[in-house]
């Protein structure tokens, strides 16, 4: 793990789970695998606190455990999963996607499961139904069946998956020679055959509305009811987690479709969307291109509100194939032409566009021209750079050296003579896309870390003011609930002076900007990560 | 050999000077004396952030998630270490998390056994049963020696001392659980006497006749 990733993971853990878990998590990341005793010794925390933190991390899938180096008889070793921690940055995007695909019910289901790590189907259904009932007008309540159907749809499209079972429960029947280990390595969730099978549960009823006046009693009654209700449903031990890979495939498809729509037009975007939708189930996650689809199939599968004639569809497909971005390729001529979507090449092009845009925004359009030139032409001498880019020599030199000092451009020496004399050596400039993408990804992690730290600093500076405003809001809310007069309300509101109100407003504005910046940087992180992973998969 | 001669062509460089970017007579850029500034002035202003309904919804989601995750049981706060003096406000601040409890119940079958934190029940019942369990064998042992009354009396004295020792050991082992119980005893005592008089100064004479019960040698006057 790089230093920036470790720093970002630490900040994210601290934000969501507190300082104790941050301490434990950072030590685990830095030291690789550790046993419980070693971890308690390193972090100098109480053993119970370390146990609690590990429970939290395992519950959220960020930490895995397995038999240690001494085999099943030795102490258990814990291994942290950094990508899962970095996914926490993307939770709002997952929830918003679920909302756009499956409505409010789907959104709440995904939100509950993300916040709790793993949940059983019955508890998810009950909690979501209660939350939806709470927001509905009086007298209405959410039926469990609707929530169950939304859950089933999420599972059918693979957005939710079962947590992999622990093998230790099944190995207890083996002979005495191999004693069942206290713990075993959890398998890859996809390798379990029942990964996406819904359990049969007997759950019927309505969401319960929680009245604010009888909060305490309702909580106790709800807690007691939960204990009795959980024994009725038949899905003990079957926990569900969010399938991040499926969400990432969806985001990748969205990026490709929006790129095509921007570059060509809306109809081409729709055609590519149809092609991707048709090959959702037939294409594996790491495939370089989708299955070949014939033009006839595409024509039949187009949405009915798009009245495109067959020859026009053929023209669009030809345009897409001829486009230099190479999103769509032709794989054959049968069935009116076989077409594939080149996934890896599309990702590479999107990453290249990101790199070019970064250079353009930081160093100007002329430096971007030099950068694009070097990307296309591979190795060029300084004189050739000046000629091809049509930039005067002095400025070209300055820009090249700036890019070189930022490590975006590499210098390659090719000696003509064995003594490497400078006057008889070629100096060639080049840009390698993959290492540059990795460099930018680290910059992005550092950026998000800086944004989070700045937000924490701003919050800490104005802590007194924020607490005061929270107290006043609480007082206002309680006054309104008990039906106070308008004069009392205005009196309480005036406790915050006008300059304080301005300060609060500007603080809110800053924090919104920083949060929004984090979300936007995360989109770039996703694109670069997908590109880097796609290059690794193809090797 | 051409470049090695010192006398002739002293000012020749081994590489093409023009490629450096400045001529021989030009002034070099000024040397830097300090590290580069922490926030260097930017040449180009950054592009403004995206706006739109989608962006604002995700922003609201992010802030809500952050706020609600602080209330979930997964947000672990270390229990405050005991300060040197016990304060009056400690009685009213029992909402503090204790280190040895876990506020949510995970599926223990999915976690390794060593992580299991057993939530301990209130200590009164457990110490009561422990004392009962340990008393029974001792009471049985003393019943066997009923014939020698002096020895049984001596053994009862020894048993009470041993029980006190066990009580002390239990107190050392289970510090946190017993202290609230012990503090409750103190509170009850203090609440009973709400006067300013210190209880130990007052001798209500109950112990006068009771001390001499064991030794019947001395006559009572």
From Swiss-Prot, chain A:
Described function: DNA-dependent RNA polymerase catalyzes the transcription of DNA into RNA using the four ribonucleoside triphosphates as substrates. Specific core component of RNA polymerase III which synthesizes small RNAs, such as 5S rRNA and tRNAs.
Subcellular location: Nucleus
GO CC annotation: RNA polymerase III complex
Keyword Protein transport: no
Source species: Danio rerio
Presence of the UniProt keyword Transcription in the record: yes
Compositional bias segments (type: Basic and acidic residues): 212-230
Main location: nucleus
GO molecular function terms attached to this record: single-stranded DNA binding
PANTHER family assigned: DNA-DIRECTED RNA POLYMERASE III SUBUNIT RPC3, RNA POLYMERASE III DNA DIRECTED -RELATED
Domain of life: Eukaryota
Family recorded in the similarity comment: Belongs to the eukaryotic RPC3/POLR3C RNA polymerase subunit family.
One GO term (biological process): DNA-templated transcription
Protein's name in the database: DNA-directed RNA polymerase III subunit RPC3
């Amino acid at each position: 793990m790089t230093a920036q990733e470790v720093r970002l993971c630490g900040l994210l853990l601290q934000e969501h789970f507190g300082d104790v878990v941050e301490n434990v998590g950072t030590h685990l990341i830095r030291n690789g695998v550790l046993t419980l005793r070693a971890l308690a010794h390193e972090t100098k925390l109480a053993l119970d606190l370390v146990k609690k933190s590990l429970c939290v991390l395992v519950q959220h899938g960020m930490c895995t455990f397995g038999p240690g180096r001494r085999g099943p008889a030795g102490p258990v070793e814990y291994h942290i999963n950094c990508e899962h921690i970095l996914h926490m940055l993307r939770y709002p995007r997952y929830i918003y996607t679920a909302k756009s695909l499956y409505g409010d019910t789907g959104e709440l289901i995904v939100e509950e499961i993300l916040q709790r790590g793993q949940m059983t189907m019955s508890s998810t259904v009950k909690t979501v139904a209660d939350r939806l009932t709470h927001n509905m007008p009086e007298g209405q309540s959410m039926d469990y069946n609707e929530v169950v159907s939304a859950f089933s749809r999420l599972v059918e499209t693979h957005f939710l998956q079962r947590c992999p079972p622990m093998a230790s429960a099944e190995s207890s029947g083996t002979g005495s020679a191999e004693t069942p280990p206290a713990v075993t390595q959890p398998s890859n969730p996809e390798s379990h055959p029942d990964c996406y099978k819904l359990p049969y549960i007997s759950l019927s009823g309505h969401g319960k509305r929680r009245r604010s006046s009888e909060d305490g009693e309702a909580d106790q009654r709800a807690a007691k009811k939960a204990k009795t209700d959980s024994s009725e449903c038949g899905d003990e031990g079957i926990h569900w987690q969010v399938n991040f890979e499926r969400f990432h495939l969806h985001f990748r498809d969205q990026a490709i479709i929006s790129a095509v729509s921007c570059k060509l037009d809306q109809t081409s975007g729709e055609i590519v969307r149809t092609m991707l939708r048709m090959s959702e189930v037939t294409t594996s996650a790491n495939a370089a291109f989708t299955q070949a689809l014939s033009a006839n199939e595409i024509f039949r599968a187009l949405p009915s509100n798009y009245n495109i004639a067959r020859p026009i569809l053929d023209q669009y497909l030809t345009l897409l194939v001829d486009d230099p971005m190479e999103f769509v390729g032709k794989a054959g001529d049968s069935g009116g032409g076989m077409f594939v979507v080149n996934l890896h090449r599309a990702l590479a092009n999107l990453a290249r566009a990101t790199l070019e845009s970064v250079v353009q925004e930081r160093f100007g359009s002329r430096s971007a021209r030099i950068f694009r030139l070097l990307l296309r032409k591979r190795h060029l001498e300084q004189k050739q750079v000046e000629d091809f880019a049509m930039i005067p020599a002095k400025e070209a030199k300055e820009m090249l050296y700036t890019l070189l000092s930022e490590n975006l451009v590499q210098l390659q020496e090719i000696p003509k003579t064995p003594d490497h004399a400078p006057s008889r050596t070629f100096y060639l400039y080049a840009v390698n896309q993959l290492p540059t993408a990795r460099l930018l990804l680290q910059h992005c992690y550092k950026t998000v870390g800086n944004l989070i730290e700045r937000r924490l600093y701003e919050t800490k500076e104005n802590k007194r003011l924020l607490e005061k405003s929270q107290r006043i809001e609480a007082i206002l809310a309680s006054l309104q609930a008990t039906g106070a007069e308008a004069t009392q309300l205005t009196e309480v509101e005036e406790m915050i002076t006008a300059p304080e109100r301005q300060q609060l407003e500007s603080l809110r504005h800053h924090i919104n900007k920083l949060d929004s910046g984090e979300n936007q940087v995360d989109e770039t992180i996703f694109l670069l990560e997908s590109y880097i992973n796609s290059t690794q998969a193809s090797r | 050999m051409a470049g090695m001669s010192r006398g002739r062509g002293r000012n020749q460089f081994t590489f093409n000077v023009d490629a450096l970017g400045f001529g021989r007579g030009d002034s070099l850029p000024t040397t830097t004396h300090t590290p580069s500034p922490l926030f260097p002035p930017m040449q180009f202003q950054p592009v403004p952030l995206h706006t739109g309904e989608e962006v604002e919804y995700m922003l609201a989601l992010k802030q809500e998630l952050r706020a609600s995750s602080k209330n979930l049981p997964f947000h672990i706060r270390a229990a405050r270490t005991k300060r040197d003096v016990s304060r009056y406000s400690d009685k009213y601040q029992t909402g503090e998390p204790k280190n040895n409890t876990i506020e949510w119940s995970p599926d223990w079958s999915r976690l390794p056994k060593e992580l299991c934190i057993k939530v301990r029940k209130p200590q009164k019942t457990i110490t009561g049963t422990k004392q009962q369990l340990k008393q029974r064998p001792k009471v049985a042992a003393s019943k066997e020696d009923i014939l020698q009354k002096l020895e049984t009396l001596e053994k009862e004295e020894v048993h009470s001392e041993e029980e006190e020792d066990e009580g002390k050991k239990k107190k050392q082992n289970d510090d946190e659980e017993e202290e609230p119980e012990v503090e409750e005893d103190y509170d009850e005592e203090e609440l009973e006497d709400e006067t300013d008089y210190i209880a130990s100064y007052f001798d209500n004479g109950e112990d006068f006749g009771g001390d001499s019960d064991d030794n019947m040698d001395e006559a009572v006057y």
